[in-house]
Every structure is written in structure tokens, then in C-alpha cells.
Amino acid sequence: MIHVLINTLAEKMNEFLSSYYERAEIIVEAGSIDATPNEDQSDKIILSIVNIERETAMGISAPYRNTKNNTFQQTSPPWYLNIYIMVAAVFSSKRYLESIQILSDSISFLQQNSILKLPDQGTITLEPVTISIQELSNIWSILGGHYYPSILCLSLIHISEPTRLGMI
């Protein structure tokens, strides 16, 4: 489900930005942010997951449910996950002003699409996260030390039952 979130967000943001900017290559890409971006990653908006945490404000339900036979069956309780996504303008220093403009348009996209429908997964919410300069410095240090203009977004995902791997 997380890969569907990041891929859908990248595709929709790329469609939005492509209507404003005529470029042969894609503008938005999901991937890790490298300290020294390679040619494929340079001059793009990069979406990168920087943290995943369990949201407990929704409550943690009991792992049992009532069945049709009035018996109880053990289940996996649903999880709510906070996915932190860094939206960074990874451009060469010569294209700094262009990177700021494209990042600004990316923020407009996020504002206009704060609720995003995922294919066969339901909807997710997107909201900007305010972090201190110290926290921002820590994040960029972990990502390799080179700062790029960026915004941090939070997405809430609901995972109702384990799907792919099943239970042991």
C-alpha cells in the first residue's frame, strides 16, 4: 500500500506539473534523495519517504471479532500509519530559481489535492508538516548532508488487514 501511495502521488503530481512545463523527461520521481544526485535524478522533484510511524490516536482495537456463528476469531487489529514524505527540488545550482518555481507549483498541487484517491486502496490525506530548523537539519544530515529546497508532508494510511504475506 505504501508503494501505491508514493507512485500515485508521483504520477499525479507529474501530470499536474507537465501541464505547466514542457520537458522531455519526467518532472517528478519517487526515490531516495542522494547527496550527489545522478543524471537520472537531477533537475527533478523527488518524493522520498523519510519516516513511517504508527498513529495511536485512532485507538488500538482488540484482536478479536465476532463471526457469523457467534464465536470469536482472532484477527490482526487495523493499523493507522503516518507516512512522512519529503518533496524536494533536486536541481543543479544553476537552475535554483526554476527549482523554486517548480517546488512552489508542487506545493500548489499538494494544497489542491489534500485528499487523494488511491487505485483500489481508498483515500489518503496529505498535509504539510511544520518542523524546526534543527529537525530539518537532522533530516538532511541523515539524507546525505546536502540541502535542497523542500516541504515535508504527512499522509495517513489505514491498513485494515494483512494482505500479501498473511499471518504466521
Regions found by a protein language model. Give the residues of each.
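Small/polar-rich, solvent-exposed N-terminal microdomains that initiate assembly or binding
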Residues: 1-64
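Short, charged, low-complexity patches
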Residues: 2, 6, 78, 99-103
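Scaffold/interface architecture of coatomer-like assemblies
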Residues: 53-56, 60-62, 67-76, 107, ...
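Oligomerization/assembly interface segments of phage tail-like spikes and tubes
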Residues: 75-91, 104, 148-156
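Short, conserved charged micro-motifs
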Residues: 94-97
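Acidic, glycine-rich loop-and-strand cores that form catalytic or ligand-binding grooves
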Residues: 99-124
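Aromatic/basic-lined ligand-recognition segments
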Residues: 127-146
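Single conserved hydrophobic/aromatic residue that forms the stacking wall/gate
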Residues: 157-168
